[in-house]
From Swiss-Prot:
Cofactors that this protein relies on: Zn(2+)
Residues that, per the record, bind Ca(2+) 2: 280-281, 283, 294-295
PANTHER family to which the protein is assigned, alphabetical: ADAM A DISINTEGRIN AND METALLOPROTEASE DOMAIN, DISINTEGRIN AND METALLOPROTEINASE DOMAIN-CONTAINING PROTEIN 28
Native organism: Crotalus durissus terrificus (South American rattlesnake)
Taxonomic lineage: Eukaryota, Metazoa, Chordata, Craniata, Vertebrata
Free-text remark on how the cofactor is bound: Binds 1 zinc ion per subunit.
Protein name per the record: Zinc metalloproteinase-disintegrin-like crotastatin
InterPro entries noted in UniProt: ADAM_Cys-rich, Disintegrin_CS, Disintegrin_dom, Disintegrin_dom_sf, MetalloPept_cat_dom_sf, Peptidase_M12B, Reprolysin_adamalysin
GO cellular component, one term: plasma membrane
Length: 421
């Protein structure tokens, strides 16, 4: 499964924000600020393409009236404020994986940017901030690529790290020389981070219509108006795609995709993806497109020796959720612990309505907070929960989890598996 995850194409749906000082700096000219940000995006895209990651700009916001947070010269404080604003405001308006704030302010000391290490796909921490510190947009783009690198699990390079001659992207200090490569250490950091955390949001390919930047033929991503995109003409080796026009060559039906073979659609019924487990199904081609549509077993089908029920292609059971939260020795707590879910507080509730925690009904207690026994030398408490004020939903019993024979959790209630949920 790890190898399958590593080999999969990754997509970072990026949202860029420019603050009020940026707007003033570029003469209150929205077009100038937008152009600056598009130019930056066009530098970031090929940098990450080498890492098997496509960066798609899915949103752009310019604070042309007033800042939506207090942008200040303390980078730490500004990053925290920006991340909170993203989590509470931006995410509810526009779905994206990562947000970066470009500011015209001077940060204290030599800092040109800051980003949370390993924050990608996290509601609170998938964010960075960068100072518009140079007239040369390449250098600012590299600073954003650097902060995104932190979000993707990369630490600063040590002296022994190498990417060729220049300092690499994750160098600890700013360079006035542009470097477009990640070091061997960064690539190792990133791979280890992916294996350990397997962030899911970056597996989802954005739609052509999600991308807000002008279409660029040669950036490896098929955008509105393009039929294919195999990169710049000098490097494209795709016999199906005309790299100069991003159109299919004469006679070609397709250029890429799991249901495309030698520029033709694969036949209807051809298997394009094997079943991953008992809740998945083998996926097949239609013969009419390159898409390999993901199919899975119906919700409610028993799985894992009748310990769970299939839900959206997975088999969520409490035992696995306790191990994920507390480590390999953890087990599910005794039934008595789940009675805390009837209290309707931080430690026990079934769902939230307008941010109010709703206590569980007696029959629903196993669809609220998950109670686990860590079974470790330092923790012998039989009733443990995982609670983080920054991500209150983490540590709740997952939707679709078996809560009784013939029943599964749906929206904090223990419902019959034969009803749609």
């Amino acid at each position: 499964e790890q190898q399958r995850y590593l080999n999969a194409k990754k997509y970072v749906k990026l949202f860029l924000v420019a603050d009020y000082i940026m707007y003033l700096k570029y003469g209150r000219n929205l077009t100038a600020v937008r152009t600056r940000m598009y130019d930056i995006d066009n530098v970031i895209t090929p940098i990450y393409h080498r890492m098997n990651i496509h960066v798609a700009l899915v949103g752009l916001e310019i604070w042309s009236n007033t800042d939506k947070i207090i942008v200040q010269s303390s980078a730490d404080v500004t990053l925290d404020l920006f991340a909170k604003w993203r989590a509470t405001d931006l995410l509810s308006r526009k779905s994206h994986d990562n947000a970066q704030l470009l500011t015209g302010i001077n940060f204290n000391g030599p800092t040109a940017g800051l980003g949370y290490l390993g924050g990608i796909c996290n509601t609170m921490y998938s964010a960075g901030i960068v100072q518009d510190h140079s007239k040369i947009h390449d250098l600012v783009a590299i600073a954003i690529a650097h902060e995104m690198g932190h979000n993707l699990g990369m630490d600063h390079d040590k002296d022994t790290c190498t990417c060729g001659t220049r300092p690499c992207i994750m160098a600890g200090a700013l360079s006035c020389e542009a470097s477009f490569l990640f070091s061997d250490c960064s690539q190792k950091d990133h791979q280890e981070f992916l294996i350990k955390n397997m962030p899911q949001c970056i597996l989802k390919k954005p739609l052509k219509t999600d991308v807000v930047s002008p279409a660029v033929c040669g950036n490896y991503f098929v955008e509105v108006g393009e039929e294919c995109d195999c990169g710049p003409p000098r490097t494209c080796r795709d016999p199906c795609c005309d790299a100069a026009t991003c159109k299919l060559r004469q006679g070609a039906q397709c250029a890429e995709g799991l249901c495309c073979d030698q520029c033709r659609f694969k036949g209807a019924g051809t298997e394009c993806r094997a079943a991953k487990d008992e809740c998945d199904m083998a996926d097949v081609c239609t013969g009419r497109s390159t898409e390999c549509t993901d199919r899975f077993q119906r919700n409610g089908q028993p799985c894992k020796n009748n310990n769970g029920y299939c839900y959206n292609g997975k088999c969520p059971i409490m035992a696995d959720q306790c191990i994920a939260l507390f480590g390999p020795g953890a087990t599910v707590s005794q039934d008595a612990c789940f009675q805390f879910n009837r209290e309707g507080n931080h430690y026990g509730y079934c769902r939230k309505e307008q941010n109010t925690k709703i206590a569980c009904e007696p029959q629903d207690v196993k669809c609220g907070r998950l109670y686990c026994f860590p079974n470790s030398p330092e923790n012998k408490n039989p009733c443990n929960i995982y609670y983080s004020p920054n991500d209150e939903d983490k540590g709740m019993v997952l939707p679709g989890t078996k809560c009784a024979d013939g029943k599964a959790c749906s929206n904090g209630q223990c419902v019959d598996v034969n009803t749609p949920y």
